[in-house]
Structures are given as C-alpha cells and as structure tokens.
C-alpha cells in the first residue's frame, strides 16, 4: 500500500539517491544483495513503500535512475548498494547534457524520455496504490534540471492526482559549480512552480555549514552532505513505513503546508545534529530537539528564517514520546515566537509522531517549513540571471538547441512573480482582508 517511486535524474540526483537507498535499506534491514537480514517485523511490515518483492524474497528498490551520460551510473553500480537496483531501471544516454538545460529538456533528454516513462509506468503498475513520485535532482546542471523538469511535466500529465515531490538542490550563494547555473535554475523553477506539489529546496553551502559548524567535520565530502539529505528524505516518509501514533504522508504534508498553490517551496531541517565529541553533553528530549529544529543553523538552505515568517511548518518526530509533550512544545514555540508565524493562519504547525527512531538515535525530528524567506534564494538567482541575460551571455548555447528568448523572459517574470507573492503574504496582516478580496479573483 501507498508506494513511492523514487526517480533520480542527473549526477547530483543519482549520488543523493544512492546514499538515500543505503539509509533506507539499512532502516529496513535489507543488505546490498536485496536480502532481508533484519531482526524485527516492523521493518518488513511496510517495506513495500520503497521496495518491490521479487522472486526468492529479494527486495528491489522502486527506483528509476536517469542520466544523459554513463559515468554516474557506473559509479552507482560500483557503490556499496549498486547491485540492489533492477538493471532495466538504469536509463542513460551517451552524449551528456553538458550543463545545458535546453539539451536536457528539448534535445538529448527528449530522445530518452519515452524509455524513461516506460520504466516509470512499469514501476507504477507494480504498485498497489501509488502514493506519488519523489524526484531527486539539482537545478544547476543540465540533466537534473532540464530532463528532470521534462519528466515531472510528463508524469504530471499521466498521473494528475498523484503527489509529485521534488528534492531540488539549489545553487549556493557563494559557491558555484557552473557558470550557467542562474539560467538553468530559473528555467527549472519556472517548471516546478507549475508542475510539482512540494519542492524541498536544499542548498550545498548550507549543508557545508552544518558539517563544519555543527558536526565539526574538517573536510566534508559530497558523501557527508548527501547523508544529511538522506536523513531528511527518510524522515519525511517514515510515517508511511513504520507504525506511529500520529501519522502523516506526502499528501497530508502537501495539504497542511501549501496555503496557495504556487507557494510550495519548503525549507528542511533535521535534529539532533551534534559532533561526535559533544554528543554526550547534549540532552535528547522533546524540548531539546524542538529548539534545535527551529535553529537557523540547522536549516539546509542559505536563507534565514528570521528574515521571513512561517506560513506553515511541519514537525515529524521519530521515537518513543508522549503526544502531549509534543503538542505542548509546538504550542510553546508558536507562542514564544509568534512574530515569526503568520497570524492569519492559526495553529500553523502540523506535527506527526512515528514510533521508530533512525538507526543509532533515541529520538529525532525532521522539520519542513514553508517560510517566506525562501524568496531570498529566488531573488538571488534572479539577479544573477538578469545580469547575464541583459548581455545575452551564453544564450547561443540555448538558442542553438531550439529555444526561444521568449522562454527566458517568461521564466524570469514567473520567478519575479513568485518572489513578490511571497513578499505580499509576508507583509499581509489580519486587518487588511478587504484589500485582498478584489485581487484574489484571478
């Protein structure tokens, strides 16, 4: 019941994805060959959310791995859990998208998209009751952003009533991997605004900061960053996979977190995070993790929640705890920091409790917040986009693949609209209701 098909597009998506499958397999007691080695029935009870049972009791991830070049696939296959995936579910081209959104979305990616949709269809058909798709990709490259958004829009057509959830790695403010990131990101956001139900925005720089400051790792690798992301992805879906006192699923998350259809870009956080040395000095109680969860240093985006206000938030607790305590803490947070929460949505924190904590922890909490400060990120990318687009720098790479300049202008204005929508709701108060009634008619 309630299965999720996980799609990984591009190098970034596949690296996060393969780390994520290590975490999930570990939680369910599945070893790298797909054999169940666990010790508790709870691990098996709803293992089928992410795994399909093949002949001989072998568990196969419901994963679709896509890339436009074979390199990443080879490294996934060579990784610790490389043999667990179905070989047919690796779909790759030979040419690569070369960090070009147009190649991923219109030329190279479009040639591959039919075979990808076939595999997705097969996976969806083997499900009892498909809950939705989760897509891991980055917005700065070519494949994850271009082909990822193409796939999202195709899946949207075919499964209009299923939840479409994306884990999107957004370019960082200071560190840039690619010069054309602003173009690729803006074009992708333009698609995500229309086609996804919930987008978790994750930012490499914020992840580096968490590794440096909180976990005290001197030289964090992408593996460490991806592990952090996996912890969150696993936390978001743990209610589907393990029994709990207060359950939540992808649809409940969307219903409770998205006040207006376009504002579905969330911030993520995870607690407890502490360095190996300081673990024994920290408390592990509901108030402790609640406090750490709302800490700006724990957010996986380079946007400061203090600069915006929470439209809605969701706290997904894991571990044995009393519901009363959780409710008290949530109320407490809202009362103490009421200025950071929008007052025209009362009780805007949703909480859920799952009984099984992650490996090695007594208690953990995953935080998903819809904060207006995420506009900082879009605004930053928009400024970089405008600076390059005004001079038409690098544009020939995109027009050469058949794109039109109009698309860039549309994407830019769509992103600017998004920023101003966030700003409008950040400034809105209860009193001004009369003014908005006329505007809301569109």
Swiss-Prot record:
It comes from the Eukaryota. Pfam families: Tubulin (PF00091), Tubulin_C (PF03953). GO terms for biological process: microtubule-based process. GO terms for molecular function: GTP binding; GTPase activity; metal ion binding; structural constituent of cytoskeleton. CDD domains: beta_tubulin. Its cofactor is Mg(2+). Keywords: Cytoplasm, Cytoskeleton, GTP-binding, Magnesium, Metal-binding, Microtubule, Nucleotide-binding. SUPFAM superfamilies: Tubulin C-terminal domain-like (SSF55307), Tubulin nucleotide-binding domain-like (SSF52490). GO terms for cellular component: cytoplasm; microtubule. InterPro entries: Beta-tubulin_BS, Beta_tubulin, Tub_FtsZ_C, Tubulin, Tubulin/FtsZ-like_C, Tubulin/FtsZ_2-layer-sand-dom, Tubulin/FtsZ_GTPase_sf, Tubulin_C. GTP binds at residues 11, 69, 138, 142-144, 204, 226. Belongs to the tubulin family. This is Tubulin beta chain. It comes from Trypanosoma cruzi. The lineage of its organism: Eukaryota, Discoba, Euglenozoa, Kinetoplastea, Metakinetoplastina.
């Amino acid at each position: 019941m309630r299965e999720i098909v996980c799609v990984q597009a591009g190098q970034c998506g596949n690296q996060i994805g393969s780390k994520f499958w290590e975490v999930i397999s570990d939680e369910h007691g599945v070893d790298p060959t797909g054999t169940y080695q666990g010790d508790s029935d709870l691990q098996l009870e709803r293992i089928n959310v992410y795994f399909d049972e093949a002949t001989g009791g072998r568990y196969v991830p419901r994963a679709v791995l896509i890339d436009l070049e074979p390199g990443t696939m080879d490294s996934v296959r060579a990784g610790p859990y490389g043999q667990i995936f179905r070989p047919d579910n690796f779909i790759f081209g030979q040419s690569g998208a070369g960090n070009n959104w147009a190649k991923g979305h219109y030329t190279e990616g479009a040639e591959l998209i039919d075979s990808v949709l076939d595999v997705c269809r097969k996976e969806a058909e083997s499900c009892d009751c498909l809950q939705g798709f989760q897509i891991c990709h980055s917005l700065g490259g070519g494949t994850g952003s271009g082909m990822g958004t193409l796939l999202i829009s195709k899946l949207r057509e075919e499964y209009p009533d299923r939840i479409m959830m994306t884990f999107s790695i957004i370019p960082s403010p200071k560190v840039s991997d690619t010069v054309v990131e602003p173009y690729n990101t803006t074009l992708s956001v333009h698609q995500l605004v229309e086609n996804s139900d919930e987008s978790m925005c994750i930012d490499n720089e914020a992840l580096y900061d968490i590794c440096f400051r909180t976990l005290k790792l001197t030289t964090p690798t992408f593996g460490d960053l991806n592990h952090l992301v996996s912890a969150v992805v696993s936390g978001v879906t743990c209610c589907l996979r393990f029994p709990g006192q207060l359950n939540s699923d992808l649809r409940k998350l969307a219903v409770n977190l998205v006040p207006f259809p376009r504002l579905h870009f969330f911030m993520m956080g995870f607690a407890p995070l502490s360095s190996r040395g300081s673990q024994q000095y920290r408390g592990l109680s509901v108030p402790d993790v609640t406090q750490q969860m709302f800490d700006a240093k724990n957010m996986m985006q380079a946007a400061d929640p203090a600069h915006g206000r929470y439209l809605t938030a969701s706290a997904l607790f894991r571990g044995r705890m009393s519901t009363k305590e959780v409710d008290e803490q949530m109320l407490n947070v809202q009362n103490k920091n009421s200025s950071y929460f929008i007052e025209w949505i009362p009780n805007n924190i949703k909480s859920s409790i799952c009984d099984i904590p992650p490996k090695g922890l007594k208690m953990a909490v995953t935080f998903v917040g819809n904060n207006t400060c995420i506009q900082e990120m879009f605004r930053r990318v928009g400024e970089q986009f405008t600076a390059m687009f005004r001079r038409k720098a690098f544009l020939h790479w995109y027009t050469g693949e058949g794109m039109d300049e109009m698309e860039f202008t549309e994407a830019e204005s769509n992103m600017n609209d998004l920023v101003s929508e966030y700003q409008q709701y950040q400034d809105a108060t209860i009193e001004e209701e009369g003014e908005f009634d006329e505007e809301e008619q569109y």
